């Protein structure tokens, strides 16, 4: 048997969920069961936390567990932030599969997303993070200020577009 867990110890558990939906408790059980938490209750807490802002989007949720209490924090991916910035109507995940988004977001939105993602980015400078987010825009299928995100990446690379560091 594994050793008993110290109840005052802080443990972080990461789970991918669809916003606003109660995930299967069976998928949560192996991760949080040993920590002395009820998977069904945690599933409901996650659904409640993600229902407002992230409904229908796949996001990562960080569960911080201490003293058999779980604190839910949403850790959105770059793609989730880009799709949220598109402000598209919510779709039924079960009916519509493999969606190509064809909206348009502003370059200011892209830099704002880059600032949010900056701590998790590998890039040395903010301009590199902005280029990462533009790459995500390509994958999502949206345009930025009516232009192809690849063209904007090229302009940043060549120094035609300046991105302030702060």
Curated annotation (Swiss-Prot):
GO function term, MF aspect, one: rRNA binding
BP terms from Gene Ontology: translation
CDD domains named in the record: Ribosomal_L11
GO cellular component: cytosol; cytosolic large ribosomal subunit
Keyword Glycoprotein: no
Family stated for the protein in its record: Belongs to the universal ribosomal protein uL11 family.
Name of the featured protein: Large ribosomal subunit protein uL11y
Native source species: Arabidopsis thaliana
Gene encoding the protein: RPL12B
């Amino acid at each position: 048997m594994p050793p008993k867990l110290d109840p005052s110890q802080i443990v972080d558990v990461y789970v991918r969920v669809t916003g606003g939906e109660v995930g299967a408790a069976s998928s949560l059980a192996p991760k949080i069961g040993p920590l002395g938490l009820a998977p069904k209750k945690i599933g409901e807490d996650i659904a409640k936390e993600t229902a407002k802002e992230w409904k229908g989007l796949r996001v990562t949720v960080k569960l911080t567990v201490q003293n058999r209490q779980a604190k839910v924090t949403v850790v959105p991916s770059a793609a989730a932030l880009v799709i949220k910035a598109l402000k598209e109507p919510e779709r039924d995940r079960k009916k519509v599969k493999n969606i190509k988004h064809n909206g348009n977001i502003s370059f200011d939105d892209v830099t704002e997303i880059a600032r949010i993602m900056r701590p998790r980015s590998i890039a040395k400078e903010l301009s590199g993070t902005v280029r990462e987010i533009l790459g995500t825009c390509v994958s999502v299928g949206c345009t930025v200020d009516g232009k192809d995100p690849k063209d904007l990446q090229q302009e940043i690379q060549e120094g035609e577009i300046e991105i302030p560091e702060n």
